[in-house]
Design a protein with these regions (language model features):
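N-terminal intrinsically disordered/low-complexity leader segments
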Residues: 1-4, 203-204
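C-terminal/domain-terminus segments
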Residues: 2, 17, 111-131, 187-194
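Helix-turn-helix
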Residues: 11, 15, 19-53, 57
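Short, basic, alpha-helical segments at the C-terminal edge of helix-turn-helix-like DNA-binding modules
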Residues: 30, 59-74
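Hydrophobic alpha-helical connector segments
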Residues: 57, 72-105
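Hydrophobic/aromatic residues within well-ordered alpha-helical segments
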Residues: 58, 62-66, 93-96, 100, ...
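Amphipathic alpha-helical packing segments from all-alpha helical-bundle domains
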Residues: 99-106, 119-146, 154-164
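Hydrophobic/aromatic-rich alpha-helical bundle segments in the mid-to-C-terminal region
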Residues: 113, 141-191, 198-205
Length: 205
């Protein structure tokens, strides 16, 4: 059995990160990645089935850990809905924000690849599915607890989409981690006040 050349794998990963970060998934070239790594394109295909697989290998976010953390958040949202307790609702929002802030800080470049450089990839499709499911769950959460018959729930989807765009803009602009922390602190004030007002609007007949 041939011994895997880990040094070569490291060169491929380094070259791939540089190429995808600069050009994004759609415009990145496997030929250029192979050349930067000092191998042939054919040799690259012996390790990765194609560009999608190589791109996905660069994103090693701790999905299981994030999922477990979000499960705790879901329980808080459930509690706030059952009790109609705005303080528990705000606590859930804070915890959810902390999860994403920590992810941005710990895996900054991978988040850039995921949110800003994945257009056209299978990774982008998976992310879009996750976002769509999140929209659906959030809208359902508010519908179940709402006493306000005139509330337009399309607004919830638009607000959530705006928040996602906010995260994407932070990554697009290439701010330092220190600046991201400052920006997120200001955003938290805005987000928490807005959601608190929406919550109160929903539970008022």
């Amino acid at each position: 059995m041939a011994v895997k050349n880990h040094l070569l794998d490291d060169k491929i990963i380094k070259a791939a990160k540089e190429e995808f970060m600069e050009f994004g998934f759609s415009k990145a070239s496997l030929h250029k990645i192979a050349a930067k790594a000092g191998i042939t394109t054919g040799a690259l295909y012996t390790r990765y089935k194609g560009k999608d697989e190589l791109f996905a290998s660069l994103i090693t976010l701790p999905i299981d850990k994030i999922t477990d953390s979000l499960e705790e958040v879901k329980q808080l949202y459930k509690e706030s809905r059952e009790k109609l307790d705005v303080d528990v609702f705000i606590e859930a929002i804070k915890k959810e924000e902390d999860i994403f802030i920590n992810m941005l800080m710990d895996k900054y470049n991978e988040c850039v690849l995921l949110m800003c450089k994945s257009e056209g990839s299978n990774v982008e499709k998976l992310v879009n599915e996750m976002i769509a499911n999140n929209y659906k769950e959030s809208a359902n959460y508010f519908r179940v607890m709402s006493k306000n018959k005139n509330f337009d729930f399309d607004a919830i989807e638009l607000i959530l989409n705006e928040q996602l765009y906010f995260y994407k803009m932070i990554l697009d602009r290439g701010y330092t981690k220190e600046k991201v922390v400052d920006i997120m602190a200001i955003n938290r004030i805005y987000v928490e006040a807005g959601w608190k007002r929406i919550f109160e609007e929903l539970v008022t007949e």
